[in-house]
Amino acid sequence: MAAQRVAMRNIKECLRLKFEGGLSHEKIARALQLSKGVVSKYVTAAAETGMEWPALAVLDEVALAAALLPTARVRQTRGERVLPDLITIHRELRRKGVTLQLLWEEYVAAHPEQPTYRYTQFVEHYRRYASTLKRSMRQQHRAGEKLFIDYAGPTLPVIDPATGEISRAHIFVAALGASNYTYACATPGETQVDWLTALGQAFSYFGGVSEMVVPDNPRALIAHPDRYEPGLNRAALECARHYDTVMLPARPRKPQDKAKAEVAVQVVERWIMRVRHQQFFSLHALNQAIAKLLEDLNQRPFKKLDGCRREWFERLDQPVLRPLPQHPYEVVTFKRCKVNIDYHIEVNGGFYSVPSALARQSVDVRLSAHTVEVLHGNRRVASHLRLQRRGAYSTQSEHMPASHKAHREWTPQRLLDWGERIGPQTRQIVEHQLTHKPHPEMGYRACLGLLSLARQYGNARLEAAASRAVQLRALNGRTVRNLLKQGLDQQPLPKPATPAAQPSSHENVRGADYYTQEELFDDDPTHPEPIAPTAAGRHGPSTGRTMDAAGQPQPELR
């Protein structure tokens, strides 16, 4: 079967869709009606030229065909040719903008009097050298371009000195693509806060920011998993925006996308796990031990390359890293809230005001350790300091409608004075409302609702209803309002219950004062003789009988 013939304009369009559009081979093939094999063939041919896409894009069809489709390969003689410095070439290719074409030209210029290899043989020698390295080392990462991050599998124990409880610390690993310069730290877990906090610490350790960050596909950072374009959650996007970088998660189950991170994790597991037999009583102590091991790791010489991680970092990545922002990223969380009718939202037990026009609408809340920001339509509409007490209110006057601003000007004394002008019973209810509501704002509203009844019913009726409410011991505005609605304030107050009838005066009836006399409790034998009762009881002595000193009746003489 004859090979598929492709017009040069389609080849050029194929390369544009690949290098500018970033489309997959399958999508390009479908768009241009080509096979995936043909697309791969020309993309590979373009890569083999050593030229970047902008250089290929300016070529006409004839020049592009000459670059991509050489009609014959010139055989090279096996004379004494100068062998290029392959280790230096491998290192230099990590610099941004450096290509094999440029390095070949420099190689030829450096040996003007000696026979050198043609470009194709130059590339062939380098590829043979690169094939002796590990696969992950063959990937070309530009200096300062990518930072790979991941978590190591094993965890380390941390003992609580107070309770003896053991928690497991997770090891975060970050490695720069060009130099393999590595950072690691221990975190309490692998939550969103842990990922983003550790990433900020890694940037601080490197002293700069890479162009891209390549994480795995952690749930803590991914909102919408996808094989080709996984969607980051809002916190991860904000973190990337703060550091002026791009976060590009690797594809699920595609370890080759983050081979640098996989290798770094393996190195860290073998190097830092030397502390696994030590006991640590805080995360800080564990991170101090990890920091010491990191210095040794980054200064250890490479096995197949010259130098060490630190030397390569100082030579390649460090000069081209982007500057750090003035302040590190403060990790935030987002939640969706609905504004209550009183133009407040509830966040973790606290109540925060928003513009009153947003009542009953949904807003986004950006919650940090110290602030609460409210967003509507991606625009910040309110900002509050975070409340530390549950049930507390944070209300800003500019969020209140005009009528509520007037209400806010009321003070407890002003409300009490208004109630006093209506009547003492009304003032008593106002005072009760101010002191028995859980929040002062609630007390103000209740008092204003009570006092506003005077406009509808008049001061006299309000005071009468307040008097009846006080008598009923129902000191609240609802009771007063119901009394006014039913007209009960215009009925006379019920008379207080009359006390029970007192017994008639009698010489044997003693009052309360009698039992407080000290003489009743005096054991002095000079106590006066008791007076015989004038009336005989059922079993008592008869009338006219005298009593002896002991109080006993004397025998009657007949």
From Swiss-Prot:
Residues 139-336 form the Integrase catalytic domain. The keyword Cell inner membrane does not apply. Keywords: DNA recombination, DNA-binding, Transposable element, Transposition. GO terms for molecular function: DNA binding. GO terms for biological process: DNA integration; DNA recombination; transposition. The keyword Membrane does not apply. It comes from the Bacteria. Residues 486-558 are annotated as: Disordered. Residues 11-93 form the HTH IS408-type domain. Residues 23-44 bind DNA. Required for the transposition of the insertion element. Belongs to the transposase IS21/IS408/IS1162 family. PANTHER family: TRANSPOSASE RV3428C-RELATED. This is Putative transposase for insertion sequence IS1162.
